[in-house]
């Protein structure tokens, strides 16, 4: 994930929105369509919360991590075109300043993946990465499911793939030959 974020230059017109988009996807596990639908009114800066308009016309509030908020602020102050109309957070960098679509968000991820040398990756892979990071930091499947806004626990279980590398560190080495 670090390589993906590092390939975005926060000092450029395209780097700031890309960095904000990738951070939202990677840290909160948002879907591409949820990032595209994000509106300025969905961010409650005082409470440190973000309202996500998800599948099934759901509206869920999530905590807004400091790093995510900082990247959004950097984009809003120095990246979002002044002439942009409407309340959508992410808009095209060049006129006409229309809201980004979910396909445009997916393209941001794909381009960043290529620049980072990761090959072709999609926005949904960052959702899986977010779930894995939550699991590694001690989050329960229930907590992860709530953050990812899964309707069924079984869906969350799919995201909790076995981390073979971590298991190797926990497992004892094979003692030797069979008797």
Predicted regions mapped to residue ranges:
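Conserved catalytic core of the tyrosine transesterase superfamily
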Residues: 1-179
């Amino acid at each position: 994930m670090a390589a993906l974020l590092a390939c975005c230059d926060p000092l450029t017109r395209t780097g700031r929105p890309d960095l904000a988009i990738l951070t939202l996807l990677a840290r909160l596990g948002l879907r591409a369509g949820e990032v595209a639908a994000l509106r300025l009114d969905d961010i409650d800066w005082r409470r440190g919360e973000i309202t996500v308009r998800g599948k099934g016309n759901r509206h869920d509030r999530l905590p807004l991590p400091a790093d995510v908020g900082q990247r959004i602020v950097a984009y809003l102050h120095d990246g979002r075109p002044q002439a942009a109309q409407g309340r959508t957070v992410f808009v095209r960098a060049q006129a006409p300043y229309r809201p980004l679509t979910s396909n445009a968000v997916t393209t941001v991820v794909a381009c960043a993946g290529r620049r980072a040398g990761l090959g072709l990756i999609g926005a949904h892979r960052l959702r899986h990465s977010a779930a894995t990071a939550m699991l590694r930091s001690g989050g329960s499947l229930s907590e992860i499911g709530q953050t990812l806004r899964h309707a069924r626990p079984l869906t969350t279980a799919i995201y909790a793939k076995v981390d073979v590398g971590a298991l190797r560190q926990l497992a004892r080495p094979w003692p030797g030959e069979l008797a």
